[in-house]
Structures are given as C-alpha cells and as structure tokens.
Design a protein with these regions (language model features):
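Proteins enriched for Cys/Gly/acidic motifs involved in redox and nucleic-acid/cofactor modification
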Residues: 1-78, 117, 132, 153-161, ...
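Conserved SAM/AdoMet-binding glycine-rich loop
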Residues: 60-186, 196
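Glycine-centered loop/turn positions within well-structured domains
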Residues: 30, 42, 76, 141-142, ...
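Conserved, mostly hydrophobic/aromatic
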Residues: 32, 52, 70, 106, ...
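Radical SAM enzyme [4Fe-4S]-AdoMet core and its adjacent flexible, acidic
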Residues: 79-96, 100, 146-147, 210-241
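Active-site proximal loops enriched in glycine and acidic residues that flank catalytic Cys/His/Asp
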Residues: 72, 108, 136-138, 174-178, ...
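Terminal RNA-binding accessory module
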Residues: 218-313
Length: 313
C-alpha cells in the first residue's frame, strides 16, 4: 500500500444530487475477530484533509448538495495514521465553515474513538446533524473481548451518557450482532436490557455469520442458527416498541425536512435525525416543494419507524 491514498477518490455516487456520501479514509485497523476488511483492504489510510474540503466545497457550491454523509470503516480514526491524533474534529470545523445551509452527517463511528472534543464540536455546530451512527455490536464484556472490540460495557454506557448530556436531542443509531460464539442466555439478556434501557432512535441487528479467514470462524461455542434467528426477532420486536415511543414524542414539534421525492399522497423527506436509505422517512402534506429544498414541517402523526408532517407555510 502507498503511504498516502490517492487524494482523488472516485466519489460514491449518491442516489439523488441533494445528498452525497464522502469517503474520508480507506482500510481499517480495528481487526474485529468476525471481519475480513483489514485483510482485504489493508491498513487505515486517511485522505488528505484538503482534498476532502475541496470535494465537499464542490459538491455544495457547484452541485447544490444539501447533505454530506461522511463515511469510512471508522470515521473517528481519521488522521491517526497521518497526524498521530484524532483529526475528525478539525475536519468537521473546516467542513462546517463551507456553508451554513448544509447538513453534515457522521456515519460509522467507533465507540472507543469518540472523543469529548468530537462531541463538543457536534454540540456547537448548527450544520452538523444531531445524529450519530455508533455501532456498538454488543454490550457484554466477554463478547466484546471475543469480538476483539475495543471498549467495554462501562465505557459505552458512559459515552452514551455524555453524548446525550451535551446533545439532548441527538438521534443515535447502532448496529448489533446476535448469536456470536459464546453468547449464552445471560449475555443475550444483558444485550436485550441494554437496548431497552438505552433507547436508540435507530437500530440494526444482524445474526452472526461465519466468515472464512476470520479468527471467529473457528471459535468454540458456536450458536445454533434457530437461536440466532429467535434472538434477532426478539431485538427487532423490542426496538419496534422503543422506536414508536421515540417517534410519538416528535408529534407537535416543528422540524426542518429535506424534501426527497414525490409520492401519490404528497411528498417524502427526512430531518437531520434520519440518515439516507437506512432510517425512517417523513411523509409530507402541503404545497409541493422542489426536491432538495429544506422546509419547516409540523409533525402530526407517527408510526413505528416513520413520521407524518404538514408543511408549515
């Protein structure tokens, strides 16, 4: 691998011109025991900060992009290879200065690398979304250790507490793996309790899948497929209730909504609290708006994963 990746990464093409994904690094240093990425893509390589700024500036000021989602295997490790320190806060400061009228979204962070400085910058910047994708994968210390995940139950709980204290209206997304080798009833019950107690706004859960060439492939105490499916189902059912409770709290609130498309009964969009493609949507009633416009919307109804709103004239 070259010591620095090419500064002119081809941009991942977004589904619509108003939203774009910008890759800030390649490769991964985390070496989770279930994952092949470090073997396939090599060591973590941060992109040059100037090339990222240039790309985002062009997306925003030339292409009219309204939302920039930063992506990498772990965006929070940005700069550690080139500057020997976490550079994401510095990158965010520079990106936030490009325009007041953009949403900057943080995807794929690592709980062990989210610093107080990062949380403070998010809290202070009006154009950084009140949203954080924070995949924890599990919460039981012995499972986290077997997964070779940095962090612990105490560290993750403390981090979420600090994030919510500084940014009370933040929407947190997480990803979980159920049925990892060694996950017994006790470990699973602990995970279930954590999901209920923490109340993530968005959550994805995946039954563990054996991957050839990973350390976990040969771990003892593999979990039966039926048990994995059952655990997956239990978490999803619980999350449905958690999500519905959270969505109902938005009724009566006025949110800025990015209009994304037209449907038979009106329009559909998202607020800063929903990421493109993976989270719920907001169905809009009112005068037709241009796609890519951000409009104030009063939330009038909620379902388990979506909201309904009326455009405020």
């Amino acid at each position: 691998h070259p010591s620095h990746p090419s500064s002119s990464y081809p941009r991942i093409i977004a589904t619509l011109p108003h939203t774009a994904y910008v890759k800030i690094a390649d490769g991964c240093n985390n070496c989770c025991s279930y994952c092949l990425i470090p073997a396939l893509r090599g060591k973590y390589q941060s992109r040059d900060i100037d090339s990222i700024i240039k790309e985002v500036d062009s997306l925003v000021n030339v292409a009219g992009t309204r939302e920039i989602s930063l992506i990498a295997q772990d965006i929070t490790l940005y700069g550690m290879d080139t500057h020997e320190r976490f550079m994401l806060p510095e990158l965010l400061k520079q990106l936030a200065a490009i325009s007041d009228n953009i949403w900057i979204r943080l995807m794929y962070t690592h709980p062990a690398h989210v610093t107080d400085e990062l949380i403070e910058i998010m809290a202070a910047s009006s154009n950084i979304c009140r949203y954080l994708d924070l995949p924890v994968q599990h919460i039981n210390d012995s499972i986290l250790q077997a997964m070779n995940r940095k962090g612990s139950f105490r560290q993750i709980k403390g981090l979420i507490g600090r994030i919510r204290q500084l940014i009370p209206d933040i929407a947190l997304r997480t990803s979980l793996i159920v049925g990892f080798p060694g996950e017994g009833e006790d470990e699973f019950e602990m995970l279930l309790g954590f999901v209920e107690e923490t109340g993530f706004e968005h959550l994805g859960v995946f039954p563990y899948s054996k991957e050839h060439g990973t350390p976990a492939f040969n771990f003892p105490n593999q979990v039966d497929e039926m048990v994995k499916e059952e655990r997956h189902h239990l978490i999803m059912e619980l999350q449905k209730k958690v999500s519905f409770k959270k969505k109902k709290k938005k009724i009566g609130k006025i949110l800025d909504v990015l209009v994304e498309g037209y449907i038979e009964q009106g329009m559909v969009g998202r607020s800063q609290y929903e990421a493109p493609e993976i989270d719920g949507a907001i169905y809009l009633k009112g005068r037709y708006q241009k796609i890519g416009e951000i409009v104030p919307v009063e939330i009038i109804a909620a379902t388990e994963y979506d909201l309904v709103g009326r455009i405020v004239s």
